[in-house]
């Protein structure tokens, strides 16, 4: 499935992204389901995996393991229906720095 985009999130977020045109949606209901689904998406070679900030925080070690210093898969974290979470570091800034080598200034 190279070069495909997938959304892995709570059912409401998955529905919203699929209505917006994402064809591969994977609703998850708990951390264990999310962990298993993330591994499957990486194994299936999805290029971009969209997930929520909440799931990203829960699976931070797994995300770091799968992305490492590679450009793909790109795992993008978005707010869920409850809004954005306060974080010490911004995963998007970390992603940009890792992929293109430039640190974004706030």
From Swiss-Prot:
Protein name: A-type ATP synthase subunit F
Ion transport listed as a keyword: yes
Disulphide bond pairs: none
Gene Ontology MF term list: ATP binding; proton-transporting ATP synthase activity, rotational mechanism; proton-transporting ATPase activity, rotational mechanism
Family: Belongs to the V-ATPase F subunit family.
InterPro entries found in the cross-reference section: ATPase_V1-cplx_f_g_su, ATPase_V1-cplx_fsu_bac/arc, ATPase_V1_fsu_sf
Top-level taxon: Archaea
Function: Component of the A-type ATP synthase that produces ATP from ADP in the presence of a proton gradient across the membrane.
GO terms classed as biological process: proton motive force-driven plasma membrane ATP synthesis
Subcellular location: Cell membrane
Cellular component per GO, a single term: plasma membrane
Species this protein is from: Methanosphaera stadtmanae (strain ATCC 43021 / DSM 3091 / JCM 11832 / MCB-3)
Key words, A-Z: ATP synthesis, Cell membrane, Hydrogen ion transport, Ion transport, Membrane, Transport
Gene: atpF
